[in-house]
Protein backbone atom coordinates (compact mmCIF):
# COMPACT_ATOMS: atom_id res chain seq x y z
CA UNK A 1 0.00 0.00 0.00
CA UNK A 2 1.68 3.16 -1.22
CA UNK A 3 0.49 6.77 -1.20
CA UNK A 4 0.09 8.38 -4.61
CA UNK A 5 0.24 12.04 -5.60
CA UNK A 6 -1.44 13.39 -8.71
CA UNK A 7 -0.67 16.80 -10.20
CA UNK A 8 -2.69 18.17 -13.11
CA UNK A 9 -2.37 21.53 -14.84
CA UNK A 10 -5.21 22.82 -17.00
CA UNK A 11 -5.69 25.84 -19.24
CA UNK A 12 -9.33 26.87 -18.98
CA UNK A 13 -11.02 27.68 -22.27
CA UNK A 14 -12.05 31.30 -22.87
CA UNK A 15 -15.40 32.09 -21.26
CA UNK A 16 -15.52 28.81 -19.31
CA UNK A 17 -14.13 29.92 -15.93
CA UNK A 18 -17.48 30.02 -14.12
CA UNK A 19 -18.45 26.62 -15.50
CA UNK A 20 -15.08 25.26 -14.40
CA UNK A 21 -15.59 26.67 -10.90
CA UNK A 22 -19.08 25.15 -10.71
CA UNK A 23 -17.81 21.73 -11.79
CA UNK A 24 -14.86 22.04 -9.41
CA UNK A 25 -17.23 22.74 -6.50
CA UNK A 26 -19.32 19.68 -7.46
CA UNK A 27 -16.17 17.57 -7.60
CA UNK A 28 -15.07 18.82 -4.17
CA UNK A 29 -18.45 17.87 -2.68
CA UNK A 30 -18.16 14.35 -4.12
CA UNK A 31 -14.60 14.01 -2.85
CA UNK A 32 -15.61 15.13 0.64
CA UNK A 33 -18.66 12.86 0.85
CA UNK A 34 -17.70 9.74 -1.13
CA UNK A 35 -13.92 9.42 -1.33
CA UNK A 36 -12.65 7.66 1.77
CA UNK A 37 -9.03 7.43 0.65
CA UNK A 38 -8.46 10.87 -0.85
CA UNK A 39 -6.10 12.67 1.53
CA UNK A 40 -5.73 15.92 -0.44
CA UNK A 41 -7.68 17.53 -3.27
CA UNK A 42 -6.60 21.15 -3.77
CA UNK A 43 -7.13 23.54 -6.68
CA UNK A 44 -4.88 26.54 -7.32
CA UNK A 45 -5.35 29.33 -9.91
CA UNK A 46 -2.80 31.58 -11.55
CA UNK A 47 -3.33 35.36 -11.16
CA UNK A 48 -5.78 35.78 -14.05
CA UNK A 49 -7.50 32.42 -13.39
CA UNK A 50 -6.82 31.21 -16.92
CA UNK A 51 -4.90 28.17 -15.64
CA UNK A 52 -5.14 25.95 -12.61
CA UNK A 53 -3.18 23.24 -10.87
CA UNK A 54 -4.91 20.44 -9.01
CA UNK A 55 -2.95 18.50 -6.40
CA UNK A 56 -4.41 15.18 -5.31
CA UNK A 57 -3.07 12.68 -2.79
CA UNK A 58 -4.44 9.18 -2.20
CA UNK A 59 -3.71 6.67 0.53
CA UNK A 60 -3.31 3.92 -2.09
CA UNK A 61 -4.10 2.83 -5.65
CA UNK A 62 -7.56 1.57 -4.72
CA UNK A 63 -8.41 5.05 -3.44
CA UNK A 64 -7.21 6.65 -6.69
CA UNK A 65 -9.33 4.22 -8.72
CA UNK A 66 -12.37 4.94 -6.55
CA UNK A 67 -11.83 8.68 -6.93
CA UNK A 68 -11.77 8.36 -10.72
CA UNK A 69 -14.97 6.32 -10.64
CA UNK A 70 -16.75 8.82 -8.38
CA UNK A 71 -15.79 11.77 -10.59
CA UNK A 72 -16.31 10.11 -13.98
CA UNK A 73 -19.09 12.34 -15.35
CA UNK A 74 -17.66 15.52 -13.86
CA UNK A 75 -14.18 14.72 -15.17
CA UNK A 76 -15.59 14.33 -18.68
CA UNK A 77 -17.35 17.70 -18.38
CA UNK A 78 -14.18 19.38 -17.10
CA UNK A 79 -12.06 17.93 -19.89
CA UNK A 80 -14.50 19.43 -22.41
CA UNK A 81 -13.72 22.98 -21.19
CA UNK A 82 -9.98 22.79 -20.51
CA UNK A 83 -6.78 21.93 -22.30
CA UNK A 84 -4.50 19.63 -20.36
CA UNK A 85 -1.12 21.29 -20.01
CA UNK A 86 0.41 18.38 -18.11
CA UNK A 87 -0.35 15.71 -15.56
CA UNK A 88 1.78 13.47 -13.40
CA UNK A 89 1.12 10.58 -11.08
CA UNK A 90 3.85 10.08 -8.49
CA UNK A 91 4.28 6.81 -6.60
CA UNK A 92 4.03 3.04 -6.96
CA UNK A 93 0.61 2.25 -8.46
CA UNK A 94 -0.92 -1.21 -8.31
CA UNK A 95 -1.07 -3.39 -11.41
CA UNK A 96 -4.80 -2.58 -11.69
CA UNK A 97 -4.13 1.17 -11.69
CA UNK A 98 -1.25 0.73 -14.14
CA UNK A 99 -3.63 -1.16 -16.45
CA UNK A 100 -6.18 1.65 -16.16
CA UNK A 101 -3.50 4.16 -17.19
CA UNK A 102 -2.09 2.07 -20.05
CA UNK A 103 -2.37 3.72 -23.43
CA UNK A 104 -3.19 7.22 -22.21
CA UNK A 105 -0.73 10.11 -22.34
CA UNK A 106 -1.86 11.92 -19.19
CA UNK A 107 -1.00 11.42 -16.45
CA UNK A 108 2.60 10.49 -16.96
CA UNK A 109 3.79 8.07 -14.27
CA UNK A 110 6.86 8.77 -12.15
CA UNK A 111 8.01 6.11 -9.67
CA UNK A 112 10.20 6.79 -6.63
CA UNK A 113 13.95 6.97 -6.87
CA UNK A 114 14.83 8.50 -3.50
CA UNK A 115 12.39 9.27 -0.70
CA UNK A 116 12.91 10.71 2.75
Regions found by a protein language model. Name each.
Residues 1-52, 59-70, 80-116:
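Short S/T/G/P-rich N-terminal loop/turn motif that feeds into the first structured element of a domain
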Residues 72-76:
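A short, acidic, amphipathic alpha-helical segment used as a generic capping/interface helix at domain edges
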